[in-house]
Amino acid sequence: MNQFYQSTTGGQQNNNNGNQFQQYQPQQQQQFQQYSPSNANNNNTTTTTTTSTSKKGKNKDNQSKQQQIQQQQIQQQQQQQQQQQQQIQQQSVDTPSSYNGDGSDDGSDTERENKKNRNRVNQNLASRNYRQRKKEYIKEIEEKLAVLALENDQLKKENINLKKGGGVEIMKPDPAFITMMMEAKQIIIQLDVAIKKNDERSLIYLLQLFHLSIEKRHTIVEREVEKMVHPYTQAKLAAMGYVPSLENPMISSISGPSSDGWWTMYISEAQITEEQAKAIKQLRSNHWKADIELRNEREKLDRSIKEFYLNRVMVFPTNERLNKSFATNLSLSDGPNPTSPNSSSVTQSTLVRPSPGLTLLNNLNEENNNSNNSSNSSNNNTTTNNNNNNSLTPTPNQNNNISNIAVNGTISVVNELGFSPINGNIDISEILEFTRKLEALKKNFVKQRTLMEDTHSALSSILTPKQEAMLLVRVHSSTRYDFANMEMLKNVWGSVIAKDTTSYPQPPTFSQQTQQLQQAQLQLQNQTKQQQQQLQNNNNNNNNNNNNNNSFNNSNNNNVQNNSSNPSTPGGNNDQQNIYYTSSPSIPSSPYNHHQQQPSRQ
């Protein structure tokens, strides 16, 4: 093995093998030469010359065969050596290592250490990148949380201001509406600059932008109208007695008769022709007529909506109602029947079952009546039972005092004025009619807005771009809506209201009180259940006692009839008494029954 590792190339090894083979052949030849003379001498001594020649030929054949066999063996050895060298080379390629003379594998150890170092470096890089990404993600989440915290604080402040009455969000303009107004103002400023420069292309472009902004503003205005037409807003306006102004200053300053003065000045300044002036005049008159129709419709709708609120939702005392109430002497408990005021009987349709509280009171009254009237005769008992059973039905005298009993036990009086001031139920048809009126009011406002847009588009078709730009600059130069001032006013008002409310004492907390109330309610519920069970048991006992009394009285009546039909003899009376006493043990023994037996003996 050491010879193979010390050799550097395979060629040198092959040369060495060849030299060994050459050395091996002369030795064999010498041995063969030594062997052949000895054999010849031996043959000469034992045999003749003829036999010696034949043996020599055979020996030559054997020698040739042996040489061939030896050559084959040498070739096999060479092949085995080559295979071993190839295996060693493959092992060195697969696992490169530098062997020392002692056989230690220092190369493999260094490779393992290098691999470990590489893996460690890769793991460190991966962990460093992960920590970096984690820090960035946490930082991003913290920033979002900070933004949300600021928004939450702002919303809390706004809610506090709303609770204190500092601002009404329903009246706050939409942010989109504010942006649209600011964009329109910027377009007007750019139109003024383009007019001064006499740039028609920029005028056309800016006018197109202005028309687009008006179309976008339509949807925003519709949302603002929905806020104003909301039932809560209309209820507040009706309660305050607010009546809106029917004349819109924006419309009257453009299409009204009072706007003729500045229109004439504009016609002369913009150099409008006679045909254009006639078309503008006709357009203004048509716009004014349509606006008058919309105003009349809006006035009727507003009046009917406020009447509904003041008659069906928020009923306030008026002179007419007070005069009628004093004239007819009406009150909450004795109002006339709305269907038949002069009738003397209550129909089943107007009577509704009473509340559980009323039934409990009636049951208590029944118990008291039964206990008080227990000592009366059978006829009185039967009449009292009938009266107690019919206590829920009103008598003709009670008809004038009862108008209607609601399902929940509350009184609902419908007086002669046609409305119910307490718990008045509204029909579904009335609610639907009222919603139609609100929808019509919303459409009225939207129609007025579309009328303005249509008038503006008609004017743009009549005028040239420069004339239209001059008109817009003149009209909108005097219009201004400062939203910053509005917000400042709202904030100042909120701070003033907050100072006023801080002077009042804060309301107490009701956490413990609510728990006590809940416990008290549970106790009351348990007590009412127990009372109802006791009342049922007492009613059952009373019914049994009444049945026994009826049977006892019937037996007494039969005895009296027998005594009246038969002649009165002492023996007969004793017999009747004996019969009575023999039949008396069948009655169940109770203090009430024993008390009823004593008068019969007398």
UniProtKB/Swiss-Prot annotation:
Location, primary (coarse class): nucleus
Residue stretches of biased makeup (Low complexity): 11-54, 66-102, 336-350, 358-401, 525-592
Coiled-coil segments: 58-94, 509-552
Sequence segments annotated as region (Disordered): 1-128, 328-401, 525-602
Limits of the bZIP domain: 113-176
GO cellular component: cytoplasm; nucleus
Subcellular location, record wording: Nucleus
Nucleus found in the keyword field: yes
InterPro entries membership: bZIP, bZIP_sf
Record note on disruption phenotype: Following starvation, development proceeds normally only until the finger stage, when extremely long and thin fingers/slugs are produced. DimA and dimB double mutant has the same phenotype.
GO function terms (MF aspect): DNA-binding transcription factor activity; identical protein binding; sequence-specific DNA binding; transcription cis-regulatory region binding
Keywords, ordered alphabetically: Coiled coil, DNA-binding, Nucleus, Transcription, Transcription regulation
GO BP of this protein: cellular response to differentiation-inducing factor 1; establishment of protein localization; negative regulation of gene expression; negative regulation of programmed cell death; positive regulation of gene expression; positive regulation of sorocarp stalk cell differentiation; regulation of gene expression; slug development involved in sorocarp development
Pfam families reported for this sequence: bZIP_1
Comp. bias regions, Polar residues: 1-10, 593-602
Superkingdom classification of source: Eukaryota
Family (UniProt): Belongs to the bZIP family.
Subunit field text: Binds DNA as a dimer. Heterodimerizes with dimA; in vitro. Also able to form homodimer; in vitro.
Full protein name: Basic-leucine zipper transcription factor B
Annotated source species: Dictyostelium discoideum (Social amoeba)
Lineage of producing organism: Eukaryota, Amoebozoa, Evosea, Eumycetozoa, Dictyostelia
Gene behind this protein: dimB
